[in-house]
């Protein structure tokens, strides 16, 4: 069972980490600090976990719904999830050293541009979930508290 409170809590954590990381990574001297790297990898884990919860639980009930609009919305969000995962994986491969949990920043300006794009992508996704997906699921299921039974 997944509740809207749990999904919103995940989204709040991701948003908070994004906001903090934007400030820390904005200072070139703090990019390689242990604290920044720890928060960055926590952000990565939170995003991956959230997408996994969404992929495994929410879409199946929507994809079989009788209304085409519901199925199309679920399909769009699933496609968006795949695209975010693809972009995220390429970003992590380029800028991260997962074994040592460090950032591999060779070109700071390029790193920051790609990081800001990635943060924007994730935050836009969260906003779309809260404004479009969750209300639709509430309407379809009639359950104001549980997104997935």
Language-model segments: which ranges?
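Small-residue-biased structural context
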Residues: 1-149
């Amino acid at each position: 069972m997944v509740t809207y409170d749990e999904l919103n809590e995940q989204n709040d954590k991701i948003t908070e980490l994004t906001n903090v990381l934007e400030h820390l990574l904005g200072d070139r001297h703090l990019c390689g600090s242990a604290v920044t790297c720890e928060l960055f990898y926590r952000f990565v884990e939170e995003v991956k976990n959230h997408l996994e919860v969404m992929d495994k639980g929410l879409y199946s009930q929507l994809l079989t719904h009788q209304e085409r609009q519901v199925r199309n919305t679920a399909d769009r969000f699933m496609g968006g999830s795949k695209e975010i995962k693809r972009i995220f994986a390429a970003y992590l491969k380029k800028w991260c050293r997962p074994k040592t949990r460090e950032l591999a920043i060779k070109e700071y300006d390029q790193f920051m541009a790609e990081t800001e794009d990635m943060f924007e992508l994730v935050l836009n996704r969260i906003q779309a979930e809260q404004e479009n997906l969750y209300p639709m699921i509430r309407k379809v299921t009639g359950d104001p508290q549980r997104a997935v039974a």
